[in-house]
Amino acid sequence: MGPQVVASAPEPTRPPSGFVPVSGGGGTHVTQVHIQLAPSPHNGTPEPPRTAPEVGSNSQDGDATPSPPRAQPLVPVAHIRPLPTTVQAASPLPEEPPVPRPPPGFQASVPREASARVVVPIAPTCRSLESSPHSLVPMGPGREHLEEPPMAGPAAEAERVSSPAWASSPTPPSGPHPCPVPKVAPKPRLSGWTWLKKQLLEEAPEPPCPEPRQSLEPEVPTPTEQEVPAPTEQEVPALTAPRAPASRTSRMWDAVLYRMSVAEAQGRLAGPSGGEHTPASLTRLPFLYRPRFNARKLQEATRPPPTVRSILELSPQPKNFNRTATGWRLQ
């Protein structure tokens, strides 16, 4: 059962000093109560509220300091502070939080103020004196929530003003092994010109292993089997050695030079008595590009070639190249 607040015998008039003795039952410590009384708005002449000083073992004087009157009716609010640390250590902690109840003497002394509310918050007794006590400010009847308690001390108030909430740096995570958060650098955004250059200057993929020179022979008309000798010992390492990739034109020229070297080697082996035999593939160069279709050139190729006479034929009567008019003749 929570503590019951019992007041002294009610009096018809308000006490001059404004003291309200409060006691707790069941060995529960009750904190000090500071009550402010406000007149009812129905009275014609508002009376200045009386403030009761804190009741404790150290304060025994009953001097009351009247507060200036206000036009708006105030709600009676109790200022409660925890007991000293030495007293709290000697007494056991309560099992259940105390239930706030207004003193009956206060209700008997102010029966007319039906519209005013009584707010008597009880602070927990397990709190140390280092924490700032709740200082409640009397609010109007229209307010339904209490203001946030201010910071304790002027230094803390100045620190709160100088450093706002949004400027406060985030506290690192506490633990035995705090893991630092990796900072991800923003990815640089490429401009249009840089992106275009990257697309144009993109590296070509690595070419496959170059094929041997024998694979280039089908592009050129191949001679008979008798004309193609076996490769010599000097040419074998040249065929197997890897080379840089070449264009189609250079590969065709390599094939022509290879055939010429093969023909020369064959002529040397046959000797001068064997006679020279030039392969038909060496009479013309291979096509270095694909020819276009041309009808005029095809027509000229189909005509018979003109005959060239090496001996001039001389007639006995020379031919006259003079012209005569029509209807006239020479005598």
Curated annotation (Swiss-Prot):
Which stretches does the entry tag as region Disordered?
Answer: 1-112, 128-185, 204-247
**From which domain of life does this come?**
Eukaryota
Q: What would be one Pfam family of this protein?
A: DUF4643
Biased composition, Pro residues: where in the chain? 94-105, 170-185
Membrane-crossing residue ranges in chain numbering:
none
Query: Could you tell me where the Low complexity compositional bias lies?
Result: 149-169, 217-238
What PANTHER family would the database entry show? PROLINE-RICH PROTEIN 33
Full protein name:
Proline-rich protein 33
Output the lineage of the source organism: Eukaryota, Metazoa, Chordata, Craniata, Vertebrata
